């Protein structure tokens, strides 16, 4: 395999993660006009999580880890797993809570928790070289938090799924939590960002 192509594979995967994060931001902006874009943005972030899992593994397996790769990975993580979940929370609540009940400043502040705390976590991870090399995480990794936020939003927005499981006790329990208590998703997202 050509050495240039070999060295490009992990970075291409990481840049694909970044591209999907950017595409999710665009879709979330468009979701103000069409609901289905919210679900599509969530699915793209779930794919980004898979890409984030394999890019580092491939780099280590091919023995081509680089400082550039580590830095671009953190940037992609910031976009896909910090900015997108915060924007996702904000847009979700703009859509489900009547505008006369929305306190935009409070909503912006609370929705920013995944972004701010995720950025702090990524900066700490990059600053502590020995922690990065041991591959131990402190707290909940940003991709896991993004999966949690996307899963909750998908549950609320995925009507076809609800048609098949409406009678199950599990669905009734989750719908009580997430549909009847609209602020529960934001509360869970904030707590998981703090972890």
PLM feature spans:
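Membrane-interfacial alpha-helical segments at the cytosolic side of multi-pass membrane proteins
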Residues: 22-29, 82-92, 148-155
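Interhelical loop and helix-boundary elements at the membrane-water interface
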Residues: 1-18, 59-78, 123-144
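Hydrophobic alpha-helical transmembrane segments of polytopic
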Residues: 13-16, 41-48, 110-113, 117, ...
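C-terminal membrane-associated helical module and adjoining short loops/tails
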Residues: 1-2, 134-195
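Multi-pass membrane catalytic core of lipid/isoprenoid biosynthesis enzymes
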Residues: 12-13, 61-122
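Transmembrane alpha-helical segments that form the membrane-embedded catalytic/substrate-channel core
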Residues: 52, 115-127, 187-195
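Topogenic membrane-insertion module of multi-pass membrane proteins
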Residues: 1-53
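Alpha-helical transmembrane segments of polytopic integral membrane proteins
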Residues: 22-25, 47, 85, 116-119, ...
